[in-house]
C-alpha cells in the first residue's frame, strides 16, 4: 500500500535522511538495512545485475519494512525508468546525465502529467484495486522522486538549465566518475573533486532541490568526519556506502584479533 517517501519527509522537516546502496540480490539484506534504522535504500542496477523478479521482491520488502526504496537504473533509459517505478520504487536515480536533454527525457519517463508522460502500470502498490487510480496519481506526484547524478562535464555545463527543470526532485554527486573527468582518476577525495561537488550542491540547494552525497564510512572510518561536516552544513540526504561494505568491518576485526591469520588470508 501507499507509504510516505522518507527522504521527502525528512527534507520537508529540515533533517537529513540516511541510507545505503544495495547490490546484494536479497530481500534479507533489505530487511536488515531497515532494522538498522536507515531511511532509504538505493537498489543498484548500474554496477550489478538484479533481475526483475528479485527487484520486485526487494522493493516490496522495503515497503513492508518501512524503508523507502529507490532504484538506480543503468542509464538514461525511459523504458528502465518506467519499469522500476511500475514495480513499486518510490524513486529512481539516473546516473551520468550529460545534458538538460537527458534530464528532460528522464522527467518524461518518471513523472505523471503535467511534468511528464508516464503511463502508470500498478503492480500491487494499489492494493490490487483497493487504491483508486486518482489516489495513486496524487501519491505518486508527491512521493515518487526523480534524482540525477551530475557527474560529467556536460551536466556541469548545463547545470543552470538542469536545475531549473520542473519535475527534477533530487541532485546527486558522483565523485568517482567526476574524478576521472577532472583528470584525477580514482581520487574521489581530491580537492578538485570535492570543490566541484560542493559547488554543485550549493547551486542545487539554491534551486530548491534535495541534495545528496555518498561517502564510504564503513569501508573507511576516516570518512565519518566528512559526513558529519556535510550534516552540519545542512545536507539533505547521505548514502553511507554499500550493503556489501560489512566485509570491511570483519577484515578490521580479524586484523585486530588475529593479525597473523588476517595477513595469511589476504596474501
Where are these regions (language model features)?
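Expand to "…catalyze enediolate/carbanion chemistry for C-C bond making/breaking, isomerization
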Residues: 1-267
Amino acid at each position: 500500500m501507499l507509504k510516505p517517501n522518507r527522504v521527502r519527509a525528512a527534507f520537508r522537516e529540515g533533517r537529513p535522511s540516511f541510507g545505503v546502496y544495495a547490490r546484494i540480490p536479497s530481500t534479507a539484506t533489505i530487511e536488515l538495512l531497515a532494522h538498522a534504522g536507515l531511511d532509504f535504500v538505493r537498489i543498484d542496477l548500474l554496477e550489478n545485475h538484479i533481475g526483475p523478479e528479485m527487484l520486485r521482491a526487494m522493493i516490496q520488502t522495503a515497503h513492508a519494512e518501512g524503508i523507502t526504496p529507490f532504484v538506480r537504473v543503468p542509464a538514461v533509459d525511459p523504458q528502465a525508468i518506467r519499469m522500476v517505478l511500475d514495480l513499486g520504487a518510490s524513486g529512481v536515480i539516473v546516473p551520468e546525465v550529460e545534458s538538460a536533454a537527458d534530464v528532460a527525457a528522464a522527467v518524461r519517463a518518471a513523472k505523471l502529467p503535467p511534468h511528464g508522460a508516464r503511463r502508470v502500470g500498478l503492480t500491487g502498490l494499489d492494493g490490487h484495486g483497493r487504491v483508486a487510480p486518482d489516489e495513486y496519481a496524487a501519491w505518486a506526484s508527491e512521493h515518487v522522486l526523480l534524482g540525477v547524478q551530475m557527474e560529467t562535464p556536460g551536466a556541469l555545463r548545463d547545470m543552470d538549465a538542469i536545475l531549473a527543470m520542473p519535475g527534477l526532485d533530487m541532485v546527486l554527486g558522483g565523485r568517482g566518475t567526476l574524478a576521472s573527468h577532472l583528470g584525477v582518476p580514482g581520487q574521489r577525495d581530491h580537492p578538485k573533486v570535492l570543490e566541484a561537488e560542493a559547488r554543485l550542491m550549493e547551486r542545487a540547494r539554491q534551486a530548491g532541490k534535495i541534495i545528496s552525497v555518498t561517502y564510504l564510512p564503513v569501508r573507511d572510518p576516516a570518512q565519518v568526519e566528512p559526513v558529519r561536516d556535510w550534516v552540519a552544513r545542512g545536507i539533505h540526504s547521505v548514502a553511507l556506502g554499500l550493503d556489501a561494505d560489512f566485509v570491511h568491518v570483519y577484515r578490521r576485526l580479524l586484523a585486530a584479533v588475529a593479525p597473523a591469520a588476517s595477513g595469511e588470508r589476504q596474501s
